[in-house]
UniProtKB/Swiss-Prot annotation:
The keyword Zinc does not apply. The gene is ara. Residues 255-317 bind DNA. This is Homeobox protein araucan. Pfam families: Homeobox_KN. Residues 492-507, 559-589, 599-614, 687-698 have a biased composition (Low complexity). Gene3D superfamilies: Homeodomain-like. It is found in: Nucleus.
Length: 717
């Protein structure tokens, strides 16, 4: 009961506080009634005990004294306490007073509770039933004990004193609410009684006469605790009497960790961790949390500090780790103000920083190129396709001429779609190594690395050739270095090519030249081989026809009137093309190339010369590596579509170019192409089933079919 009353959870005083030591009857103790009257002025707490006698802090009058108020406003320590009332009790007949009507002694007769309510014992007698207080009024009479409960009013002096010193709290360890209303207290859970967690320290209500007597000394030593309204931090964080006043958890009700500036002491731990992990200065999430706890920093501050530290080391050219692309370390933008100030104060290392950043970018580009190389397939195939000497290079300075499938640049690879000008350049230069008349082109073929420095404007050292990435291939205005120097001087190349053609006509009879060039239509150079199965069932027949008829220029953005002389030039170079597909009105060139008049050949050469001069103005526009759904060459007139051969003729063409049926010795050529029959025929047979229905009814195709039948029968027999 005493502990319960001490912390202010109940308004009932204990029996020892209500009764003096001389009256210890159970009846009187149980007869005391505490009624809260006028709570705005009268507190609900028990009066303080006097340190001298253990009695109530109320002055006792000697018996037989004069009637009246014994403590009319006296404030001395031996007089009434601050919360006591100057109430006089009319004694009963059996009291200890000398006179019958004199005032009774408070120690023997009545008692006062904490609310200023006087209790009068009515144990029978002649003088019972008087007024309980001078200015009080009786409230009720106890039916059990017959005592009269009356309420005594305060005078103005005591009311002012009580409101000054005892209004928030009335006794030791018992406190009232620090908030006048609940509207001003936003946190009701930590409201009234939360100050009971604090240990007594001092009396914040220091009265002027604190050292005037033992009672005031007792007040000071007991030490009234200030209420929660005087503290700026959450009292719930101080369980067990721990007073955390300067910690980072103060000044807020939500117990959140307070962000503070990073000091040298806190960052010393981070620097030590960074020095130990220079190979991999990327702390994990758990390590960041551990470092944040040790340094009393937030997790964001730790991550920002490490990002800034890595950036500083990069700038100072002290980078000892491989750059990583990690999503959880993309907080380089979270640079704190003090870190920015530190970087501004540091001397700028502009040249070293730019060099190191350029090195980092070069490393990242090389990594990306390596990834592209892994995705595209074997490096040997790609190097041979780009013009580098491969393992199967022939002795005649012709890359990929050794007969091995790995060194063959036109070898089938499902994801290996070369640049469109790749086939064109190979086709233009395909006759030159075969005739072998120009030594300059031979030297260009033998040293392809010399062309690396001038393509795409990206210098790459000759000692370390790299596979070009797909992004460079698509984005460059000039073609990638895959053409062995043929595209560097197109006009000069065209002139040399025409000279080679004239020499070929003088070297062989006209009929043999036509047959020979028809024999090597697409087979003299491996670049000319149409990719018969590269598109499988997707666009197998159509792309096969395009590759065959359009001479390995699968996608051309030139208008039809410009395509026609270009294709005529290609037919002139190859000698025995079946027909043209530039437009529906284009001339159909028969196979009898040797029957053509020399004047007509000269006219065609002049046309090709004009086309070459147009080409000298710039290269063909770079095309994407992946084919579109509808290639531009498919958007020709329907009459031109009827001129396309069916896919059933493509394996015949492949058979013809692989055959040795004309009686020429195989040793007269750089390689024996009949050895490639096993390489080409399965893929050609695979795609032979995809025939185009739009071209099956053409009479010209039937005529061409009749021309090929004897060759096919002769080879199979």
């Amino acid at each position: 009961m005493a502990a319960y009353t001490q912390f202010g959870y109940g308004g009932f005083p204990s029996a020892s506080q209500l009764l003096p030591p001389s009256v210890q009857t159970t009846e009187d103790a149980s007869a005391n009634v505490n009624v809260n009257v006028n709570e705005a002025l009268v507190m609900t707490n028990a009066p303080a005990m006097s340190p001298t006698g253990g009695q109530d802090c109320q002055g006792s009058q000697p018996s037989g004294g004069a009637g009246g108020d014994a403590s009319s406003g006296a404030l001395s320590p031996n007089a009434l306490s601050q919360n006591s009332n100057a109430a006089t009790v009319v004694g009963a007949g059996g009291g200890s007073s000398a006179g019958g009507g004199g005032p009774a002694d408070l120690a023997t007769g009545g008692s006062l509770d904490g609310n200023g309510v006087g209790t009068t014992p009515t144990a029978g007698g002649a003088g019972g039933g008087g007024s309980c207080c001078e200015n009080g009024r009786p409230i009720m009479t106890d039916p059990v004990s017959g005592q009269t409960v009356c309420s005594c009013q305060y005078d103005s002096a005591r009311l002012a004193l009580s409101s000054y010193s005892r209004l928030p709290a009335a006794s030791v360890g018992v406190y009232g609410t620090p908030y006048p209303s609940t509207d001003q207290n936003p946190y009701q859970s930590i409201g009234v009684d939360s100050s009971a967690f604090y240990s007594p320290l001092s009396n914040p209500y220091g009265l002027k006469d604190t050292g005037a007597g033992p009672e005031m000394g007792a007040w000071t030593s007991a030490g009234l605790q200030p209420t929660t309204g005087y503290y700026s931090y959450d009292p719930m964080s101080a369980y067990g009497g721990l007073l955390v006043s300067n910690s980072s958890y103060g000044a807020s009700y939500d117990l959140a960790a307070r962000r503070k500036n990073a000091t040298r002491e806190s960052t010393a731990t981070l620097k030590a961790w960074l020095n130990e992990h220079k190979k991999n200065p990327y702390p994990t999430k758990g390590e960041k949390i551990m470092l944040a706890i040790i340094t009393k920093m937030t997790l964001t501050q730790v991550s920002t500090w490490f990002a800034n530290a890595r950036r500083r080391l990069k700038k100072e050219n002290k980078m000892t780790w491989e750059p990583k692309n990690r999503t959880d370390d993309d907080d380089d933008a979270l640079v704190s103000d003090d870190e920015k100030d530190k970087e501004d104060l540091e001397p700028s290392k502009g040249s070293q920083g730019s060099v190191s950043l350029a090195k980092d970018e070069t490393k990242e580009e090389e990594d990306a190129i390596d990834e592209d190389q892994k995705c595209l397939g074997q490096a040997n195939i790609l190097r041979a396709g780009f013009g580098y000497p491969s393992a199967g290079s022939g002795s005649g300075g012709y890359p990929g001429g050794g007969g091995s499938s790995s060194g063959h640049p036109g070898g089938y690879h499902p994801y290996h779609h070369q640049h469109p000008a790749y086939y064109q350049a190979g086709q233009q230069g395909g006759m030159l190594p075969f005739h072998g008349e120009n030594s300059k082109l031979q030297t260009d073929l033998g040293d392809p690395k010399n062309q690396l420095g001038r393509d795409c404007g990206v210098p790459i050292p000759a000692t370390k050739p790299k596979i070009w990435s797909l992004a460079d291939t698509v984005g460059c205005k000039t073609p990638p270095p895959a053409y062995m120097g043929h595209q560097s001087m197109p006009l000069q190349q065209q002139q040399q090519q025409q000279q080679q053609q004239q020499q070929a006509q003088h070297q062989y009879p006209p009929s043999e030249a036509g047959r020979d060039q028809q024999l090597f239509n697409g087979a003299a150079a491996p670049y000319l081989r149409p990719h018969t199965t590269a598109y499988g069932g997707f666009l197998g027949a159509t792309t096969q026809q395009l590759h065959t008829t359009n001479n390995s220029i699968p996608y051309s953005n030139m208008p039809p009137q410009q395509q026609q002389p270009q294709q005529q030039q290609q037919q002139l170079q190859q000698g025995g093309t079946i027909h043209t597909t530039g437009s529906s009105s284009g001339p159909i060139i028969p196979l009898q190339f040797h029957n053509r008049h020399p004047q007509q050949q000269q006219q065609l050469q002049q046309q090709s010369q004009s086309t070459a001069s147009q080409r000298a103005m710039g290269f063909l526009e770079a095309q994407p590596d992946t084919p579109p759904q509808t290639p531009p060459n498919m958007k020709v007139l329907s009459g031109a579509l009827s001129l396309l051969p069916t896919a059933t003729q493509v394996p015949m063409t492949a058979t013809c170019r692989s055959s040795n049926a004309f009686g020429f010795p195989a040793s007269g050529y750089p390689m024996n192409f009949s050895a490639r029959l096993g390489e080409y025929s399965p893929r050609d047979d695979y795609s032979s089933g995809n025939s185009s229905s739009s071209s099956s009814s053409s009479p010209q195709l039937q005529r061409n079919e009749a021309m090929f039948k004897p060759l096919f029968k002769k080879f199979t027999n």
